[in-house]
């Protein structure tokens, strides 16, 4: 790979170093990695030195003054691991997520040095413009962040990362919807599933553009490519990877297309598993994409918002959903609030909530990796409780303002609380969720 990066110093002080994240280095045991061949800064030779695991430092030949920019050229090889992953390949399906050497974020406490950890979405990046040329063998189709402007050249503006997928077996379903080119890429005979994902994408864009603010890009690609076990999807700017574990075609194969077979899963709920993964990852275009956050230090911020987005989708489009005994998202949010407050619901006493929204991915990995998903529910229930107190319309107005306020920047928990305390008396509610 040949990479040219124009880095702008917005820190307010001179910089003698710039830190970088080389995520492929976390996959060396599976054959992945980044091999840096050459680095230069404004034409002068430089060196990337490992600081900690996937974090590297580039010493600048001269200090970069505040509000000035520098051009950094790199040449490096990316080794793609032979694993089923958001970064990996299997059976001529290549997923290239988080493969680019990207600058670390300089925050209020200095450089954010956060090595990759194999839980959640261990990435933290800032907004940038990308201009990427991709060469693939004849017969391969590419699904990427942004838009292909000329053959093999892809451009994306004001996005937080760049990713792509490639395969020689993709079928593409495409539709232009309200000015957005929607594309679903898939392998194999799952046309019905691809169509359902496309329909869910259209409904998600309608709903979220109203609830959060207009979708600001003109493409959205959804790739049914398969990820690791237990991971239903992964978000990238204008690109979503989905694991087609649940397929519409399964219902035909099981002979329960009409839902009459009591031995199989409820048809409504089974299809909801497809819809929920799709609408959740699309919601990340707003929460992670437009409104950024440190997904390592405070993963609840985007995951909680996107879990709440699932609730909005469910309430809007799936009002008569048969949950096959599992309970609706609203039921789960209400149960979580009972766990937090110690209240009963429908005569049932719930276990005490012990989920700490302040936990980082490192905390979850060390102490309770199986419990990590609890932040989705607790974070989502917080949004739900605020909506209940404000009322739906006032809350949506405030939610759109929240997105506008932090658009193309980042938000942390303190800023989140300050914003919402300005919209309602949530001090007691926050005291419950952060106790």
PLM regions: where:
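Asparagine-centered strand-capping/turn motif at beta-strand->loop junctions
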Residues: 7-11
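Acidic/His/Gly-enriched intrinsically disordered linker/tail segments
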Residues: 303, 307-381, 389, 406, ...
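A surface-exposed beta-strand-loop module
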Residues: 32-92
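Alpha-helical scaffold elements that line and support the substrate/ligand-binding pocket
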Residues: 283-292, 306-310, 378-390, 395-396, ...
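Solvent-exposed beta-hairpin/edge-strand motifs
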Residues: 15-45, 135, 139-140
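Juxtacatalytic substrate-recognition/specificity segment
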Residues: 132, 173-285, 289-298
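Extended, low-hydrophobicity, Ser/Thr/Pro/Gly-biased non-transmembrane segments
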Residues: 75-165, 169
